[in-house]
């Protein structure tokens, strides 16, 4: 509104309609009234800005509590080198030819020895590593070892016979034992087990104590 009022004041039509007599006297005489008139919308703008700033802070606080927007799974590079291993991983299961197999990848800061989930020891290369395994549990076992002993983050995938790659873990980019804002708890009750109702109270109701 203030900008629209100023635009009408300085429009050519308003200037042409004004009387061209004693311009300097009129300007000097009306200066105090213009100053007092401008002081009112200034306070109004200040209150609007203060309200907008408060709304901005509230919106920022809400955004921090919400879940992070979108997670893009890392793409699998089939050209990643495998660790140096002289033994055998037991080979892929026969179902890998008709169903799927699993691939775990990680990046090592240096060349170091690690224990294979299938037995034996291997040397992980400095930089990216890729290892094919027959079972998902083997990937989880190796990944747990990488994180606990070597402080290395990992991810693994499921590869189908058609060549399709499915990203599996960590699903939302954060490992399950870590807190992730916005992650929904499954079967979560914010109470101790001692505060559950007595099982006899829900007997024959089709419910469980943790449902109430």
From Swiss-Prot:
Q: How does it sit in the membrane?
A: Peripheral membrane protein
Q: Which residues does the annotated region (Ferredoxin and ferredoxin-oxidoreductase binding) include?
A: 145-153
Primary residence: plastid
Query: Which ranges are annotated Low complexity under compositional bias?
Result: 53-62
Gene Ontology CC annotations of this record: chloroplast thylakoid membrane; photosystem I reaction center
List, in alphabetical order, the GO biological process terms annotated in this UniProt record: photosynthesis
Triggers of expression: By light.
Q: Where is the transit peptide?
A: 1-50
Which residue ranges are recorded for the region named Disordered?
53-80
Alphabetical UniProt keywords: Chloroplast, Membrane, Photosynthesis, Photosystem I, Plastid, Thylakoid, Transit peptide
Protein's cellular compartments = Plastid, Chloroplast thylakoid membrane
Q: Record's family? A: Belongs to the PsaD family.
Q: Which PANTHER family match?
A: PHOTOSYSTEM I REACTION CENTER SUBUNIT II, CHLOROPLASTIC (PTHR31982:SF5), PHOTOSYSTEM I REACTION CENTER SUBUNIT II-1, CHLOROPLASTIC-RELATED (PTHR31982)
Role noted for this protein: PsaD can form complexes with ferredoxin and ferredoxin-oxidoreductase in photosystem I (PS I) reaction center. PSAD may encode the ferredoxin-docking protein.
Protein name, as recorded = Photosystem I reaction center subunit II, chloroplastic
In which organism is this protein found? Spinacia oleracea (Spinach)
């Amino acid at each position: 509104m203030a900008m629209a009022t100023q635009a009408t004041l300085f429009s050519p039509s308003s200037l042409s309609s004004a009387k061209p007599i004693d311009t300097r006297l009129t300007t000097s005489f009306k200066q105090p009234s213009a100053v007092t008139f401008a002081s009112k919308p200034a306070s109004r703008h200040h209150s609007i800005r203060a309200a907008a700033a408060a709304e901005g802070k509230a919106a920022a606080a809400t955004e921090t509590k919400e879940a992070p927007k979108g997670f893009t799974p890392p793409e699998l590079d089939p050209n990643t080198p495998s660790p140096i291993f002289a033994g055998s991983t037991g080979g892929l299961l026969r179902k890998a030819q008709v169903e799927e197999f699993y691939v775990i990848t990680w990046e090592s800061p240096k060349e170091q020895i690690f224990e294979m989930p299938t037995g034996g020891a291997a040397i992980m290369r400095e930089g990216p590593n890729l290892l094919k395994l027959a079972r998902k549990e083997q990937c989880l076992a190796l990944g747990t070892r990488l994180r606990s002993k070597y402080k290395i983050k990992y991810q693994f995938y499921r590869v189908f016979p058609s060549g399709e790659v499915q990203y599996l873990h960590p699903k939302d980019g954060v490992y399950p034992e870590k807190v992730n804002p916005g992650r929904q708890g499954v079967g979560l009750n914010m109470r101790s087990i001692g505060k559950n109702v007595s099982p006899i109270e829900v007997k024959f109701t089709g419910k469980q104590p943790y449902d109430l």
